[in-house]
Structure formats: structure tokens, C-alpha cells
Amino acid sequence: MDRFVYKSGEKLRCGYTTGSCAAAASLAAAEALLTGAPPERVELPTPKGITLDIPVAGCRISGNSALCSVIKDSGDDPDITNGIEVCARVELTEAGISIDGGEGIGRVTKPGLDQPGAAAINSVPRKMIAAAVSDIAETCDYHGGFRIVVSVPNGAELASRTYNPRMGIEGGISIIGTTGIVEPMSNSALVDTIRLEERMRREEGCRSLLLTLGNYSQSFIQRNMPFALDRCVTCSNFIGEAIEAALEYGFERILIIGHIGKMAKLGAGIMNTHSAQADGRMEVLVTCGLLAGADVDTLKKITECVTVDAAVSLLQDAGALEKSMEILGKRAEYYLAAKVKSSVPIGAVMFSDKFGILVRTPSADGLIERISEEYNG
């Protein structure tokens, strides 16, 4: 893929997601069926607004179906899926579009994830696949339907080296991606970007620092909090590094706002929230629930949850949610205060799309008021 980004002065090549691969393979197979000519390349629009030109690795027509494949290209940010073959078998049907997973595609066995009970092909890739075959159908004046089965040879073996089995996705990998594009960014480049943004805010005269974890946080702030977003700094998973930089640059107070699915880890003092670094979310919630008086059956069920929202629902049903979240807030602030050695006020707000604001650490309300006055004054 000939698209590049620059990170810390380094030119890095972008790649495309497994979702884009599945959509491209599906498009190639549908085109081969409808035209009788297997394509060598396909053009695929992505949610990012970028049209990809993806080579087709293989294509075979057999009667009423075709099987095509593409090779995953992760660019200069390769992961475990880089170089894998993503296949799609497309069969013509009377009407409608059905999408399923075959060999090497996991099945979602637990609630709370995208596509529960179905193949682990997430919502955006499913939409991309459906749009791709619909477009070629319109071009070829075809009015029937498609049955599409996505597969990844060796996907089951690959999945054993991921978090899929632990998350309740069994038998293979997931087809994922929200933009269709993989933009490479090394950890050091991310931290450098965070430090640069913090330094800029300090040089602009900001005395307070509002850290967000990403797009979810910023969307939530826009809807629910009294802050101007142009002064926020996104720290992604790197809460610890962002706090260290804030102290270095002399910020007088720090507030962190993020989804509880990440931020619950603060209750165990985990300052890098990437899943590859540490988890501990359910362990934290079990501890908070225990201290809040939740019954043993509820606590056992929490240990089996995949998502924090599912665990929160259990605590709510047990009548222990409010107290559990209060305890989580105190634990999180204890570790945050230890991180800054109590040198500046620091607090956090944790939310979920389903439940709204769940946690305000003890210092949070005061920080919200002070930062709101500074940012909006």
C-alpha cells in the first residue's frame, strides 16, 4: 500500500485491516462470478475515505461460486496477522446477502462482544463486505443475492497466540477494523506525540491538564462535560507516561477522562492500559464488589465476564454498583496520587456508553470545576 504517515520524523507505510482484506476478497470473488473474468486487483472504498487498490492473490471459479484471496499487509506496523491469506467464497443466491465465517474464523461464545453467537466478523467489516458485493452487483446489473464465507488458513493456530480464546472467541481469529486502514505508530512515537501536545498546552498558558484516552472520551466530553475539546490531550493507553510528562512540564492539576473498559485498570495501579501489557479489570471489579458487599454468586459471574459493561450490569443487579464504583474511584485515585507523589491534585472520571458516568474519584468534582473555569473562561 503506497500511503505513508510521518511519526517523529520517520516515514512509515500504512497497511489495511483484516476487514478490508475480507471485503476485497469478497469483491474479487463476486466480480469473478458476475463477469467470468477473475480480477488481478480490486479497488475498495474504506470508511476512512481512502480507496484501496488491493492485489488479488488467488481466484478460482467453480460453477455457481468463486473463491478469492488477498494477503494482509499491515504496513510498517506489522502484527500477528501481517502476511496472512484472507479468503472469501462467494456463492450466488436468489436474494439477500449472508456473511459467515469458515476455517480459521473464530466464533463469539460470550455476550458483550460484537456479533455474539456468530462468526467473529465485526460490524464494520460486515458492512464493507455487503457494500462491496452490492456495488459490483449494480455495475453488472445483477439482482440476485450472495452467500459469503470468509476464511483464514491457519487462523486457528494464529488465534492461540492472541487474546481471542480468553475473550470467548473460539476457533480462529477475528475480522476487525473500523476505518479499513492500519496507520503505523510505534509506542515511542506515540509517547513523543503526547509529550509534544502537553508541552504546547503548557506554552499556551494552560495550568491544568485534561487527558483523554481517545475518540470515545472526546465524544463523551462533547455530550456531557463542560470542557472545550481543543485543549484536551489524548494519551491513548499511555497514562503513566502522560502523567510523568505533565509533572515535568509543571502542570498544576491533572484530570483523566476515559471509558471504564480501560480505566478500571487504574484500580490496580496499571498505568499502561493496552491489553498486551496487562488486564486485571475483572479482578479489580471483583475486589470492589467484594468490599461493597456483593454476594459470592455475583462475584463468580464477574470473573466470567468479557466486558466491563457486563460486570457493571451484574453489580447493578446485586444492588452493589454505587458502592463498588465509589471504592473503585478511591483505589484509582490512591494509585494516581502515588504516581505524582501527591505533588499535584489528580483525579479521574470513568464512563460507559451504556451507563454514563460511573466513577468520579474523590478529587474529580473539584478538578472539573477548576479546569472548566480555566478552559472556558
How should these model regions be labeled?
Residues 42, 190, 194-199, 364, ...:
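Bulky hydrophobic/aromatic packing residues
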Residues 3-6, 13, 167-173, 178-197, ...:
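A structural signal for small-residue-enriched, beta-sheet-centric alpha/beta enzyme cores
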Residues 109, 158-160, 221, 266, ...:
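Short acidic, gly/pro-rich beta-turn/loop elements at beta-sheet edges
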Residues 345-376:
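Short, amphipathic C-terminal "tail helix"
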Residues 1-161, 165-167, 364:
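Generic N-terminal targeting/processing segments that precede catalytic cores or assembly contacts
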Residues 85, 224-227, 361-367:
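Surface-exposed flexible segments
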